[in-house]
């Protein structure tokens, strides 16, 4: 579970009172709010984006964490990773460097790629599958089902974690998460890819 979400940004609303079980994040209007004032900018979407940022998302040029107002500040998350309490920290100005602390060990620096690989093994056993010669779904593809982004259209259809998610990726991810033989979905996608290539060759 997530114990705390924090930042060196002075105005950041630290979430340090999360409890085991279901936690609901709400934005509450004040007594003086009018019917035209919404709950936007209360931090609900930023909470989701921060989790993705701290679990190794790409953080491209359009990322909120790379804006001039936020790039120099560090964001962090204290959470349980398997049976170890773990703290991860990252900033937009140095997005390729991720700092991880698992007490009593000292803080260590990882690349974003290595961090994603580590999370993939710890949460889903992906590295072990790759070592055995398989090509499992990616960590980002699987993790996005648990932390859904509204901006990606993740709530449009339950079987997809993003509007643009391909059929093969969706099928393989879901079969993996349900404990089914996900390699069947991978083989289906290989057939679709071959059929697409043949169709393109016919049209030449």
Please place each PLM-identified region on the residue numbering:
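Extended, charged alpha-helical "arm/stalk" segments used for dimerization and assembly
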Residues: 92-200
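Extreme N-terminal "head/tail" segments of very large remodeling/mechanoenzyme assemblies
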Residues: 1-84
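Gly/Lys-enriched N-terminal cap/neck module of very large, oligomeric protein machines
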Residues: 76-100
């Amino acid at each position: 579970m997530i114990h705390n979400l924090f930042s060196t940004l002075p105005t950041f609303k630290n979430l340090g009172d999360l409890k085991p079980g279901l936690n609901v994040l709400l934005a509450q209007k004040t007594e003086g709010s009018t019917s035209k004032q919404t709950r936007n900018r209360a931090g609900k979407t930023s909470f989701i984006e921060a989790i993705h940022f701290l679990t190794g998302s790409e953080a491209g040029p359009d990322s909120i964490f790379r804006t001039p107002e936020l790039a120099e500040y560090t964001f962090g998350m204290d959470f349980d990773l398997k049976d170890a309490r773990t703290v991860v920290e990252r900033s937009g100005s140095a997005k390729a460097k991720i700092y991880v602390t698992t007490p009593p060990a000292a803080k260590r620096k990882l690349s974003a790629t290595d961090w994603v690989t580590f999370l993939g093994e710890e949460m889903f056993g992906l590295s072990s599958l790759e070592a055995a010669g398989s090509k499992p779904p990616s960590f980002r593809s699987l993790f996005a089902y648990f932390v859904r982004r509204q901006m990606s259209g993740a709530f449009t259809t339950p079987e997809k974690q993003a509007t643009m998610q391909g059929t093969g990726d969706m099928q393989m991810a879901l079969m993996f998460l349900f404990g089914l033989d996900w390699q069947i979905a991978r083989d289906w996608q290989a057939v679709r890819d071959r059929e697409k290539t043949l169709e393109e060759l016919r049209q030449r």
